[in-house]
Amino acid sequence: MELMETIYNRRSVRFYTEEKVNKDTIDKLIKAGIQAPSAMNVQPWSFGVIQDKALMQKISDDTKAYLLASISAKPYLECYRQLFSNPEFNIFYKAPALLTVFAKPEGPNPSCDCTLAAQNIMLAAHSLGLGSCWI
């Protein structure tokens, strides 16, 4: 797939099959993330992969609880109160795998650097026929 085609056609996916993502594919996605530029070439990222459904559900539930508790301090979250209160809502949309990018506190702007790595991963996922969603 051509780069421009990938950029123009990638969309956030919120419905997934239950098909497992194999290790080779996950390795390709992480390698794509590692290729992202970073300020001063610090490369302040590390990656985590979770495919355990129960653990992903626990993280989803804990995240929703945290966000609900944060609404008074972060009023922009108010519009999500009903969604986060819904026990059926899974913050990861029941994806078969969760690939996280963690920012190490190094360099001038690690969160922006990790965002670039995440974008590379999402573009690579699309080029491999996989859906992704920025969470």
Region spans (language model):
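Small-aliphatic-rich amphipathic alpha-helix that forms the alpha element of a beta-alpha
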Residues: 33, 99, 104-135
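Glycine/small-residue-rich phosphate/adenosyl-binding loop
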Residues: 43-114
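A structural motif
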Residues: 26-34
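Short, cationic motifs built from Arg/Lys/His that form the positively charged side of catalytic pockets
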Residues: 10-14, 34, 56
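Specificity-determining recognition surfaces
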Residues: 1-27
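Glycine-rich phosphate/pyrophosphate-binding beta-alpha loops
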Residues: 37-41
